[in-house]
């Protein structure tokens, strides 16, 4: 997003709009993301909603993440046409607002949902007994609803503003690439708005996610019991992959955004062309999520193989798998129950066996 001066877009803005790298890279990457993400997440959503067992908090978060990915992918065709058309928006003001809010709301929703998953896994591994009352479906649903309320509130200025801008020097109308100064009353308000988005929707979730996954991995690595070692290795590997994907996809884009905000508002320089290119990394996360679901859940793998006609999966196979995952996950429960006699009783409750995702 570029903020023009009072006389119109400056030379840096015009150069960005003429940049051939952006005109080629974004449509190509967005097309790839849409082609992989839409069928992949549609199938993932079908499996998560119709074919898997009891909906644990992890499954609820994965459903929300899959819906988020689908909504983001559904607006990419408009972005593809816009950039192929030399940044000329032809779909009107209302659709520009809808596409822009949907694009950024769903991108940040992915960040917040992955943060919720990391916290749920952190509590399940490090505090399996004391956190049991909080790791329930209703709290997961409330967390998803809360993230959407936060997002829509934070992005509400975009929904109330005409995000199109006529660039007469190029004979085009942009959508969200150039913003009007009149959108907010002062430079100070621009700074508050942009820094709030960066801190609230990225920096805090980023720190929480990195801290939770790091603590979870270290806890699993310190566990010495041989029972469930394979499941533990799988959980550690997946947590590391999810953390790497989170850092790789979302960190570059948001830190470049921070550099652009500071340089644009206070020094008159722009890194918006770099920011636009790093948006590709954020969108690539949509392609990775279906693979994360596959490796995260043994039941998801079995259902996929059944759907592809590899073999019919007996129900007792899934039940046995849940038993083995439960045994692997309760190593820390056993140690905690040793110190608290009533904890062993809690550890044998069927409610704890609901964990299937190894997020």
From Swiss-Prot:
GO molecular function: G protein-coupled purinergic nucleotide receptor activity; G protein-coupled receptor activity
UniProt entry tagged with the keyword Glycoprotein: yes
Lineage top rank: taxon: Eukaryota
Induction: Down-regulated during granulocytic differentiation.
PANTHER family documented for this protein: G-PROTEIN COUPLED RECEPTOR (PTHR24232), P2Y PURINOCEPTOR 8 (PTHR24232:SF25)
Role according to the record: G protein-coupled receptor for S-geranylgeranyl-glutathione (GGG), an endogenous metabolite present in lymphoid tissues. Couples the binding of GGG to the activation of GNA13 and downstream repression of AKT activation in lymphocytes defining their positioning and growth within lymphoid organs.
Record family assignment: Belongs to the G-protein coupled receptor 1 family.
Protein name: S-geranylgeranyl-glutathione receptor P2RY8
Organism: Homo sapiens (Human)
Gene name tied to this protein: P2RY8
């Amino acid at each position: 997003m570029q903020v023009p001066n009072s006389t119109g877009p400056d030379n840096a803005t015009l150069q960005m709009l003429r940049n051939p790298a952006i005109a080629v890279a974004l449509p190509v990457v967005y097309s790839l993301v849409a082609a992989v993400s839409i069928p992949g997440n549609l199938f993932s959503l079908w499996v998560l909603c119709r074919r898997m067992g009891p909906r644990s908090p992890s499954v609820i978060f994965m459903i929300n993440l899959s819906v988020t990915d689908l909504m983001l992918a559904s607006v990419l065709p408009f972005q593809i046409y816009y950039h192929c058309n030399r940044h000329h928006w032809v779909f009107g003001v209302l659709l520009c607002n809808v596409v822009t809010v949907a694009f950024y709301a769903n991108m940040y929703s992915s960040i917040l949902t992955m943060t919720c998953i990391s916290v749920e896994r952190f509590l399940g591994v490090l505090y399996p007994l004391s956190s049991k009352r909080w790791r329930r479906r209703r709290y997961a649903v409330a967390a998803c609803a809360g993230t959407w309320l936060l997002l829509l509130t934070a992005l509400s200025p975009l929904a109330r503003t005409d995000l199109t801008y006529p660039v007469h020097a190029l004979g085009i109308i942009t959508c969200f690439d150039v913003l009007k100064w009149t959108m907010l009353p002062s430079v100070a308000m621009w700074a508050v708005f942009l820094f709030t988005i960066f801190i609230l929707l990225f920096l805090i979730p980023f720190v929480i996610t990195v801290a939770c996954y790091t603590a979870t991995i270290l806890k699993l690595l310190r566990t010495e019991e041989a029972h469930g070692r394979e499941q533990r290795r799988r959980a550690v590997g997946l947590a590391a992959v999810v953390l790497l994907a989170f850092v790789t996809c979302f960190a570059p884009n948001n830190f470049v955004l921070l550099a652009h905000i500071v340089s644009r508002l206070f020094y008159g320089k722009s890194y918006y062309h770099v920011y636009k290119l790093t948006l590709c990394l954020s969108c690539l996360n949509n392609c990775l999520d279906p693979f994360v679901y596959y490796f995260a859940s043994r039941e998801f793998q079995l259902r996929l193989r059944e759907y592809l006609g590899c073999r019919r999966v007996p129900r007792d196979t899934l039940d046995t798998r849940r038993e083995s995952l439960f045994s692997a996950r309760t190593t820390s429960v056993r140690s905690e129950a040793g110190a608290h006699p009533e904890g062993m009783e809690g550890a044998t409750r069927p409610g704890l066996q609901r964990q299937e995702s190894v997020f």
